[in-house]
Design a protein with these regions (language model features):
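Canonical Rossmann dinucleotide-binding motif of NAD(H)/NADP(H)-dependent dehydrogenases/reductases
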Residues: 43-71
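Short, flexible helix-coil linker/hinge segments at the edges of structured domains or between repeats
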Residues: 148-194
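A glycine-rich helix->loop->beta "capping" turn
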Residues: 104, 121-150
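Conserved small/polar residues in nucleotide/adenosyl-binding loops
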Residues: 197-204
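Class I SAM-dependent methyltransferase Rossmann-like catalytic core
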Residues: 3-32
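Glycine-rich phosphate-binding loop and adjoining beta1-alpha1-beta2 segment
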Residues: 75-104
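The beta1-alpha1 cofactor-binding region of Rossmann-like NAD(H)/NADP(H)-dependent oxidoreductases
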Residues: 111-122, 196
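Rossmann-fold cofactor-recognition segment
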Residues: 99-115
Length: 204
């Protein structure tokens, strides 16, 4: 497959496995040279939202600086015949490769972290890894969540509250500076965005 960049506004929405590997490798190299005192290091870490951003960086730090066992939970799209996978998918593959090279214990679950099925799988993996986690990183950025107790689906949005947002943006495709306007969120959108990250059951 030949991967070509696809630009939306000023964001490249096409990921490349080699680029993701290099990104994760650079972070791991930095973490390897930042060894923390043994007493300050977690031994077993659960990362909810482990494929990009703060979650991925926290996992890399725990694994390569502290030699911690890590379990990552993420929901990423794999590759298709003529379409590459998401960046998060390649990031996880890169992390697994580097973890194996350094003899680290690293497990992953690709699934909906809000679902009962995924929670049960985390519990089983935790048992296999030796028990409770002494550090939990919560770094989920999901656009929607279905509450397993009643089937209600909540959808998040990124909009201003109580005012119209206006600013300039760069369209790299057309090489133009444009004005962008975003209308304020409705009461329903605000409610859904807040409820998306509210625990749906006492077990959470």
């Amino acid at each position: 497959m030949i991967i070509k960049p696809r630009i939306k506004g000023f964001v490249c929405i096409t990921s490349h496995p080699s680029g993701c590997l290099e990104n994760v490798r650079q972070q791991a190299e930095l973490a390897l040279h930042t060894n923390l005192p043994e007493g300050n290091c977690p031994k077993r870490v659960l990362v909810l939202g482990a494929s990009t951003g703060y979650g991925l960086a926290s996992r890399i730090s725990a694994a390569f600086s502290c030699k911690a066992q890590t379990l990552g939970v993420s929901f990423e799209r794999g590759p298709k015949e003529e379409k590459p996978a998401s960046a998060g998918y390649y990031n996880i593959a890169a992390f697994q490769k580097l973890a194996r090279e350094h003899g680290l214990v690293a497990e992953d679950i690709n699934g909906d972290a809000f679902s009962d099925e995924c929670k049960n799988e985390v519990i089983e993996k935790a048992k296999q890894m030796g028990g409770e986690f002494d550090l939990v990183i919560y770094s989920l950025a999901s656009p929607r969540r279905t509450d397993p107790t009643d089937g209600q689906t909540y959808r998040a949005c990124l909009k201003p509250v109580g005012m119209i947002y206006k600013n300039k943006t760069l369209d790299t495709d057309r090489k133009e500076v444009k004005e962008v306007t975003i209308n304020p969120a409705t009461e329903e959108e605000i409610s859904h965005t807040c409820l998306l990250y509210t625990s749906p059951s006492p077990r959470d």
